[in-house]
A protein has these predicted regions:
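Alpha-helical transmembrane segments of multi-pass small-molecule/ion transporters
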Residues: 1-303
Length: 303
């Protein structure tokens, strides 16, 4: 694992957010454009990326390895949801803000940032492991995520049939059955899915364009959430998994994924379903900024 490889990945991501910020001030992004891009990502490019991540690997691991990764995923989310059920009650805020607190603790950025970080730490073979670990994230974030952010009153059962959830179920079935569609299918999905990450980061940057950085940096609540998200939660997961004697590579990938900043999807889902988009964008910015330091440190110290 290379400290500077991980640092470079984080700087690339921060640059994309900065580009979205500038694009908004130049009039290229903002308002209706951001909303349409959000719909494009959630309904077309993201589902393509989810399935492509599972079917484009060179070689599928044994089913026992896949089940082991999913077992780690269960521990991963049990730990997260234990904090989701307790921490937001201790922090002051509106119902919308508490929804953001819950989403922040529940859903790290295991895809957009997690995939390249896993590859930087463990090589190309780590991508499939990271993709399998991300499948529970995809299922939960697109079903429970809107419920957390917008509340039960705005939840609709048809949200469970969103393209991202359908793609996640399909990806899980393909992984467990070891079915592989023709290579051209993977190439097509990968080609479309590849625009997901830069587009999403541009939208986040655009949403931050009219936000006061000082307001974010002076918010104790956002700092508490950021420290929990970036440092405390990965440290706890590392202790638990080491006690379970999990394979070193799986443990390392899981701990690094737990230490990711909050998922960019939260901002997109807030826009789509009526959550507190401003606070969601603020905590996304702060955790992503902090992760430039904490992720390389996690790689060097915990793993």
């Amino acid at each position: 694992m290379n400290f500077f490889d991980v640092l470079e990945e984080m700087l690339v991501i921060l640059f994309a957010i900065a580009a979205g910020y500038v694009a908004n001030h130049l009039g290229y992004l903002g308002g209706e454009t951001d909303q349409k891009l959000s719909k494009l990502i959630l309904n077309i490019t993201m589902p393509a990326m989810i399935v492509a991540a599972v079917i484009t690997g060179e070689e599928l691991p044994e089913i026992s390895v896949i089940l082991s990764i999913l077992e780690v995923g269960v521990v991963f989310y049990v730990l997260e949801f234990a904090l989701v059920l307790t921490v937001p009650k201790l922090l002051p805020g509106t119902a919308g803000e508490r929804g953001v607190y819950r989403y922040t603790l529940a859903f790290p950025n295991v895809g957009f940032i997690g995939y390249p970080v896993a590859v930087a730490l463990y090589g190309d073979g780590a991508l499939f492991y990271a993709a399998i670990l991300a499948l529970p994230f995809n299922l939960l974030s697109y079903s429970l995520g809107p419920l957390m952010l917008a509340g039960a009153a705005r939840f609709r059962w048809r949200q469970l049939l969103s393209p991202c959830i359908v793609a996640s179920v399909l990806g899980l079935v393909l992984a467990l059955t070891r079915l592989r569609p023709p290579a051209i299918v993977g190439e097509m999905l990968d080609f479309v899915g590849d625009i997901t990450v830069p587009l999403s980061l541009l939208v986040v940057g655009s949403l931050l364009a009219h936000m006061s950085p000082g307001k974010v940096l002076r918010s104790p609540k956002l700092w508490v959430l950021s420290v929990l998200r970036l440092l405390v939660m990965p440290a706890l997961l590392c202790l638990v998994l080491r006690g379970m004697h999990i394979e070193a590579m799986v443990l390392g990938i899981a701990v690094s994924q737990m230490g990711m900043p909050v998922a960019v999807n939260g901002t997109l889902l807030s826009m789509e379903y009526g959550g507190d988009t401003e606070v969601m964008a603020q905590v996304t910015f702060l955790t992503t900024l902090g992760a430039i330091i904490t992720i390389p440190v996690l790689a060097a110290v915990l793993l």
